[in-house]
């Protein structure tokens, strides 16, 4: 998905204001460019990157091995339909999700989400 030059410059300026590390600014820009409509997820990523800002420059191996890029992209995003019948016999179909970020240290954490108001951005935020 192509992002306009205006949006791209706005993303970069916002990240520069919040993040000292050029590497983390680059990672954040990639996240926003890849999923420009997922504002809740952008907020969560920015908060995590801010907490890493002080240590990432002390550990150049993080950038060398793409550690932060791995953290901000889920391993799997599963979407499925959930048909159900209400008390009046009316059939409804909701969309269900499961987002799985990392299995590096064992089984995935989290559960399935079915609520009609959730979307990928909110689930990745969680």
Q: What feature does the model see in each segment?
A:
Residues 1-17:
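Short, Lys/Arg-enriched N-terminal segments with co-localized hydrophobic residues
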Residues 6, 17-126:
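N-terminal ligand-binding/catalytic initiation module
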């Amino acid at each position: 998905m192509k992002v306009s030059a205006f949006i791209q410059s706005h993303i970069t300026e916002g990240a520069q204001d919040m993040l000292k590390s050029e590497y983390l600014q680059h990672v954040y820009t990639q996240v926003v460019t890849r999923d420009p409509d997922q504002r809740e997820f952008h907020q969560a990523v920015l908060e995590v990157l801010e907490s890493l800002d002080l240590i990432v420059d002390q550990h150049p191996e993080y950038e060398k091995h793409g550690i932060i890029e791995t953290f901000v992209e889920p391993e799997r995003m599963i979407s499925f339909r959930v048909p159900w019948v209400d008390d009046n016999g009316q059939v409804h179909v909701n969309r269900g999700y499961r987002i799985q970020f990392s299995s590096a240290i064992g089984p995935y954490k989290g559960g399935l989400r079915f609520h009609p108001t959730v979307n990928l951005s909110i689930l990745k935020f969680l």
